Swiss-Prot record:
Family matches, as Pfam families: Ribosomal_L31 (PF01197)
Gene name of the encoded protein: rpmE
GO molecular function, one term: structural constituent of ribosome
GO cellular component: ribonucleoprotein complex; ribosome
InterPro entries noted in UniProt: Ribosomal_bL28/bL31-like_sf, Ribosomal_bL31, Ribosomal_bL31_A, Ribosomal_bL31_sf
Oligomeric form and interacting partners: Part of the 50S ribosomal subunit.
Descriptive protein name: Large ribosomal subunit protein bL31
UniProt keyword terms in alphabetical order: Metal-binding, Ribonucleoprotein, Ribosomal protein, RNA-binding, rRNA-binding, Zinc
Coiled-coil parts of chain: none
Keyword Ribosomal protein among record annotations: yes
GO process terms (BP): translation
Keyword Ribosomal protein in annotation: yes
Binding locations of Zn(2+): C16, C18, C38, C41
Length: 86
């Protein structure tokens, strides 16, 4: 390996927007990383389902395609349920 080509790996404080802070190691020069979501507030870890919608993408999709899935839309339009896959 070549000497002196790797960045310094130092102790870094991570600060989440929810207020949680923890220490890890990183190559960040400032020694501080600001995060929007951490394991304290992320829906996967907390069990709370909330949609992190950026720019109204979910509403735009629902407006364009409706809230029904493809199979439900076919069943609704024909009046009979659609057979599932095996």
């Amino acid at each position: 390996m070549k000497p002196d080509i790797h960045p310094e790996y130092r102790e870094t404080t991570v600060i989440c927007s929810c207020g949680n802070t923890f220490t890890t190691r990183s190559t960040a020069k400032s020694g501080v990383i600001h995060a929007e979501v951490c394991s304290n507030c992320h829906p996967f870890y907390t069990g709370k389902q909330k949609i992190l919608d950026v720019g109204g993408r979910v509403q735009k999709f629902e407006k364009r395609f409706g809230q029904l899935t493809g199979a439900a839309r076919v069943a609704r339009s024909t009046g009979k349920p659609r057979a599932g896959r095996k």
